[in-house]
Amino acid sequence: MKRIFNIGAICLTMAVAATMSSCSDEFIQDKKNYSNVSSEIYNYYSGANGRLNECYRITLPNIQAGASQMWQYNSLGMADNHSQSTEEYRNFSTFVDPQVTLNTVTGTSGAPGYFGSSWSRIREINETIEGIQGSTLSDSEKDELLGQAFFLRTWCYYLLFRYYGSIPLVTEVQNPVPESFTPRSNAQECYDFLCSELDKSAEMLKKRTVESSWSANDWGRVTTGTCLALKHRIMILWASPLFNRDNDQSRWTNAYNTIKQEIGTINACGYGLANENAPGVNGSGWAKMFLGIVNNPEAVFVSCYNKNTPDLTPDYQRNNLWEQQIRPANTLGNNGKTPTDMIVDLFPMKDGKRPATYDSYTKVEASAIAYDAEHPFMNRDPRFYRTFAFPGEYWRFNGDPNTSTSANPYTGDKYILWNYVWYNDPANFDNVMSSDHFGADNLLTSVHGMYIRKFSDDLDVNATPNYNFNTAGKNVGFRECMTSTMEIRYAEVLLNLAEAACGANQMGEAVDLLKRIRARAGYTADNNYGLPANLTGDQAACMAAILYERQIEFAYEGKRFEDMRRWLLFDGGVGLAGAGAKALTGWGGNTCTYLGFKPFVGQRRDEFVFRLQNKYNYTDGQSGRTWPFTAGDNTEKKDETNPDPILKSNMGGLTRATRDAYAVDLSETIVNKPLDEQLENLKTFYDTYLVRKKIKGDAYDSNNTPLTMSWNARYYFWGFTQGEQINNPNLPQVVGWEDYYKSGSNGTYDPLTAEPAGTTTE
C-alpha cells in the first residue's frame, strides 16, 4: 500500500499576535496582524510584505519561547531539554534520564511532540508564497519577498529533518480534509529539497542583498548569505555520522567544494568575523561581538529584540531576558544560571590545549599546564573568563541595585561578584547533598558557585548598554534588553568549512580556519594559536579538535546537543543496529573511539561552590541574618552586625576594601595590572579563605546513590507521538519507536534506507 501523510488533519490554528520584532523599531512595529486577509492584499507591496513579516514572527528562533512553543523553540542556550542533555547544565533531560524511557504510545514519558506543532506555520508560509506568486507585483518585488518566504519555510523543514530524519514535503496549501495526502519523503529526497530551496532563495535575494543591502530599518531580514550558510550547515549534517553511517567521502568533498566556492558570496553580503583584527584584552573583542545590534558582521541569521517598556499603546515590547536571567540576585537579576563542574573543568588551558585531567577528546594533545580545580580560573583560555563568572571578579553594569527593598553592597559601576558561601552546621561543610548555605554580599540563599557570563552586556566591553536598568515597575533589573541572538554566526560558517575540509582530507586548510577562530579569541602565532602540531597529518585528531573548538566557541548557544547527536557522541553509535536502525560502519563503527571522546552515557554532572574554610564557618546560627545594609547606604557596618564571617575582625579580619583588593579586573583598567598577576593575587585569597565543595547536580536514586546518564539509540531520530499517529494513520513510524497501529510493536521505517516517496510497498 502507499504510505501517505495527512497534512490537513493536524494543522493547528495559530493564535496570531500583533507584533514581531527586529533590531529596528520600525521593522518591529510593522508586524501587524496580516493573517486573515483576502488575496487582494498581495497586489500591494506593503500588504504582501506584511504577510511575510507575519511569517517571520511565527518562524524566527525566540530565546523566550519554551517547550509549549515548539514552532519557535530552538534551544538557544537555555537550561532546556536539549542543553540538559549536554555538558552545559545539570538535571537529567528526558533524553538522558536513566529512570525514564521515552515512548510513543502512552501519556507519560512521551517522545517530543515537535512534529505536529510545525505544520500550521508551514501552511501560513505556503499561503504567503502562493499569494505573492499569484499577485500583480513586479518580478523584482516577487523575488525579494519570495526569497525570504522560501527560506523561512526551509528553516521549518530543516528543524524537522534534523530531528526526524525525513518528513512529508508540503509545498502548497492543502485543504484540511482526509483526502489531502502527502507521502513521507526519505532522507535523500529531503536533503535534496532543502539544498535546492536554499539555492533558489539565495538566487532570488542576490539583487537585494549581494548587489545591494537591506537598510538599517530592515536589519534582521535574511540574505543570500543567510540562505547559503544554512545550506552549508545542512551539508555538514548530511556528511556527519547521523546521516552518513558509511562515511561516504563524496558527501564531505561535496560540502567542502560547495562551501569554499560560496563563502565569498556570504562575505559579499557584509558578513565576517567580527573584531577579527581587534581581539582586545582578555577576550574582550570576542565578548563585544555578541553585543552588536544593527550591521553586526557576525550575525548571519539573527533574531532581534528591543528594550521597549511594557504597556505602551500599541505594545511593541520584545525584550531579551538573558541578561536578567544570568545576573546575580544582588544586582536585581534573576539569580543567575549555573554551569556544571564538567563544562568548567573541560575548557582549554591558557596554551590552548585541553586540560590533562579532561579524559575526552584524547586524540587532541593535552596541556602541559597543570589544571588546578581548586582555582579553576588559573591559566585558562581567554573565552573562559567571558563565559563564566567566579568569586572575586568585576562584572560591572550600568545601574544602582540599592532600593528600598534591596540593600546591596555595590553600585553597578563598581560591582564585584563575591559569591563564596558559609554554613552554620559543621555537618554540612562537606555534605554533597546539602545546599543549606549562605552567600556573601546579600546573596544569602540565592547564590551559585559559579555563574554563566556568556553574552553578558558587560560595562567593560560596552559603554552604551543594550538594556534599560530599572529598580521598580514590571521590568525590574535588566529585563528591558535588546541584545540580539545569533542562530548562525560567522564563526560557524568558518567552522563548517573547517569540518568539511577535514572530512575531505584537507586538514591543512581546516587548521588555518581554526587559527582564525583562535586569533579572534586572543591567541597568537607564537604558540601556533594553541593548536597541536599533529592536526594536519591526523584526520581523527583534526576532527576532534574542530568539535572541541565548537564546544568552546559555541558554549551556551544551543549548538552542543546537535553536535552530539550528529556525531553520535552519546554512545558512539554502537547501539544503532540493536535499535533496528542502519548500523554505523564508517569511523571504525564507533565515533567515540575514533575521536577519543568518552561516551556520554555513564557520566554525570555535578556543581560546586566555594565555601569558607572550616575555621571561618559559623556554629552559632548567625549565618541567616538579614544583610546589614539599608537603602542608599554603601558603607560597611560594624563587625557585630555583619553576617559574613571573613568580614568580622574576630574571624577573617578583612574589610570590604581589603577583600576587594583581591578582585580581578578583565579590562585591566580598574586594576592596572596584567591578568596573570591579578589571578595570582586572587589565588592567594582562595588559599587563605576558600575551599571548593562539590554539591549535587544530577539526580540520586532513593538510596542516595548517584545516577549516571543513559541514552537509547533510537533517540538519534525521533518517533511520532501517539496523537500524531492517530491523526495520521498512514504515517510510517520511525524504526525502534512504538507503532500505535501495531499494538505498540516497533516501527520499521528508517529514513536513511526508506524508498522514495510515492513508492508502492506491500
Predicted segments with their positions:
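Acidic, glycine-rich segments characteristic of secretory precursors and extracytoplasmic regions
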Residues: 2, 8, 23-78, 101-103, ...
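Long, intrinsically disordered, low-complexity segments
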Residues: 23-24, 118-121, 193-195, 218, ...
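Flexible, polar/acidic helix-loop-strand segments at domain edges
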Residues: 362-489, 737, 742-762
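An aromatic- and glycine-enriched ligand-binding surface/loop that stacks and positions planar moieties
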Residues: 24-90, 199, 225-228, 233-435, ...
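Conserved, well-structured interaction surfaces
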Residues: 40-53, 57-67, 87-164, 178-192, ...
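Short coil/turn linking the two alpha-helices of tandem helical-hairpin repeats
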Residues: 161-162, 166-168, 209, 237-246, ...
